[in-house]
C-alpha cells in the first residue's frame, strides 16, 4: 500500500502532502522531519529524476528531483522500491504535464495544485495504484476539471 506522497522545495519545506494511511498530524510532522534528515545529503544525487531509495521506520521511500521540487513516495513493506518507482512514473509525467507551460517550479506547481490533485486521484485510489497511462489520467481529469460550474436558482 502507498502511505504518502510528499513534495518539497529544495530547502525541504513541504509544498504538498497526501497521506493514504490514518496517522495524526503529530506523527506526520515527525515523519516529515525524519525523512528530511535521512535524505537531505542524498538530494544532490537525485538530479535528472534519478530514483533513490531509503528505508526507515518500516517504510520504503523512493525519492527524486523534478525541476525545482523533490518528490517522496512512501510505501509499506508489501511494496518494494521497484513497485514504488513504477508508481512514480505517472506522477512525474502528470507533474510535468500540468507545469509544461512554465516549467516545474515551486510557484508554477502551487498554481496548478488543484489540477495535480485531480491527476493524483486518478493515479492512486485509497493507497493503491489505479491508472498509469497519462492519456487516461488526462481524460478522466479533464472531465472533472473543465466542466463549468453553473449557478442555478436554488
UniProtKB/Swiss-Prot annotation:
One of its GO terms (biological process) is membrane reorganization involved in phagocytosis, engulfment. Keywords: Cell membrane, Cytoplasm, Membrane. Component of the TSET complex, a heterohexamer composed of tstA, tstB, tstC, tstD, tstE and tstF, which may act in plasma membrane turnover. tstA, tstB, tstC and tstD are likely to be the core complex members with tstE and tstF acting as associated scaffold proteins. This is TSET complex member tstD. GO terms for cellular component: COPI vesicle coat; plasma membrane. Disruption phenotype: Knockout cells grow at least as fast as a control axenic strain and differentiation also appears normal with fruiting bodies forming under appropriate stimuli. Uptake of FITC-dextran, an assay for fluid phase endocytosis, is unimpaired while uptake of FM1-43, a membrane marker, is slower than in the control. It is found in: Cell membrane; Cytoplasm. Disulfide bonds: none annotated. Coiled coil: none annotated. It comes from Dictyostelium discoideum (Social amoeba). Belongs to the adaptor complexes small subunit family. The lineage of its organism: Eukaryota, Amoebozoa, Evosea, Eumycetozoa, Dictyostelia. It is a peripheral membrane protein.
Amino acid at each position: 500500500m502507498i502511505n504518502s506522497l510528499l513534495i518539497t522545495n529544495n530547502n525541504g519545506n513541504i509544498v504538498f502532502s497526501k497521506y493514504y494511511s490514518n496517522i495524526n498530524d503529530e506523527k506526520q510532522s515527525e515523519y516529515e522531519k525524519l525523512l528530511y534528515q535521512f535524505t537531505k545529503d542524498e538530494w544532490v544525487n537525485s538530479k535528472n529524476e534519478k530514483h533513490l531509495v531509503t528505508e526507515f521506520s518500516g517504510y520504503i521511500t523512493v525519492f527524486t528531483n523534478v525541476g525545482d521540487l523533490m518528490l517522496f513516495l512512501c510505501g509499506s513493506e508489501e511494496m518494494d522500491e521497484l513497485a514504488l518507482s513504477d508508481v512514480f512514473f505517472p506522477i512525474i509525467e502528470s507533474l510535468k504535464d500540468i507545469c509544461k507551460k512554465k516549467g516545474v517550479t515551486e510557484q508554477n506547481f502551487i498554481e496548478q495544485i488543484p489540477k495535480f490533485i485531480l491527476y493524483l486521484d486518478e493515479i492512486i485510489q485509497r493507497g493503491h495504484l489505479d491508472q498509469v497511462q497519462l492519456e487516461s489520467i488526462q481524460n478522466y481529469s479533464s472531465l472533472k476539471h473543465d466542466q463549468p460550474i453553473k449557478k442555478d436558482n436554488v
